A protein has these predicted regions:
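Short glycine-rich anion-binding loops that position phosphate/pyrophosphate groups of nucleotides
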Residues: 68-75, 144, 191-194, 221
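A short helix->loop->beta-strand "cap" motif at the edges of active sites that frequently abuts
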Residues: 99, 104-105, 157, 210-213, ...
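NAD(P)-binding Rossmann-fold cofactor-contacting core
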Residues: 154-172
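Rossmann-like adenosine-cofactor binding region
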Residues: 168-239
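Glycine-rich adenosine-cofactor-binding loop
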Residues: 15, 113-116, 123-127, 132-153, ...
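Phosphate/diphosphate ligand-binding glycine-rich loop within oxidoreductases
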Residues: 2-128
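Active-site capping/gating segments
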Residues: 121-125, 234-260
Length: 260
């Protein structure tokens, strides 16, 4: 969405690309059910620059806050006046609250991370069925993986991160039957499999999965990802990221609606 005139939208989403995102549809439906008259729009920014951030706020004088998705969850932190401790620990922000004075002038941009809460509550039923001492494997080492690790930590579950490059605790080649016996919960925190690239998938050794294993994908579009399909074919329990999306969205809205 390229703006050239003033908007009256209340909330929004910045990132690139945004064609796959269901956030606008979720909030539009919610506001219609509430009868609040509020609105939510996508702002697809090709680059996150000072000019882009300034334009976002200037051309949207009614904007109370916005969500942040890939690839800007880390970069946006450079433009904020304060960052919530949980977001600091994760090293990524997915929610920005805009504070204004009585004249509408922006007084502060404050960053939060509601991905942690969203994933924590989505994965809780799986985490609660883990045997004492069992850990989780997190596929990926980006900002999403850090939110997943923080959420699991809050549930008392240790985790290991997996990457191609060796930036994580393990590489994909390190995953063995013994590793999965110790880590029966696997989380795909990569964007692989997201629409329109639905055939893509992490190079995970699916043949080592079986009944009793649990696989949670953060991707929600499509509803069944290639990661989920392959895991389910081996008898593993699977779940997509739609509940996480809804929970983090509601947590973001609560932040925006809370008076400073």
């Amino acid at each position: 969405m390229t703006q050239t005139r003033l908007s009256t939208t209340d909330y929004g989403l910045i990132g690139r690309p945004l064609a796959h995102s269901q956030s606008k549809a979720f909030f539009t439906r919610l506001f219609a059910e509430e009868g609040s008259g509020e609105s939510y729009d996508n702002f697809e920014l090709q680059e996150l620059t000072p000019q882009a951030m300034y334009g976002l706020v200037l051309l949207n004088p009614q904007l109370k806050g916005f969500n942040v998705t890939a690839p800007y969850k880390v970069a946006v932190m450079d433009y904020l006046d304060s960052i919530d401790p949980a977001a600091e620990r994760v090293g990524a922000v997915n929610t920005v609250k805009i504070e204004r004075d009585a004249t509408g002038r922006v007084t502060a941009l404050r960053g939060f991370n509601t991905d942690v809460e969203g994933f924590r509550e989505s994965v809780r039923p799986m985490a609660e069925r883990l045997a004492p001492g069992a850990s989780a494997l997190i596929l990926g080492t980006g900002g999403a993986s850090k939110a997943v690790a923080e959420a699991l930590s809050q549930l008392g579950v240790k985790s290991l991160r997996v990457s191609h490059s060796g930036k994580g605790d393990l590489t994909y080649d390190d995953i063995t039957a013994d590793v999965l016996a110790a880590c029966p919960l696997v989380v795909n925190a990569t964007p692989l499999g997201t629409y329109p690239d639905t055939a893509s998938c992490p190079p995970f050794p699916f043949g080592l999965l079986g009944p009793g294993m649990m696989c949670h994908d953060l991707v929600y579009n499509p509803a069944e990802t290639e990661f989920m399909r392959r895991a389910a074919a081996q008898g593993a329990e699977v779940k997509n990221g739609l509940e996480m999306l809804h929970r983090q969205a509601l947590a973001s809205l609560a932040i925006w609606r809370t008076k400073s």
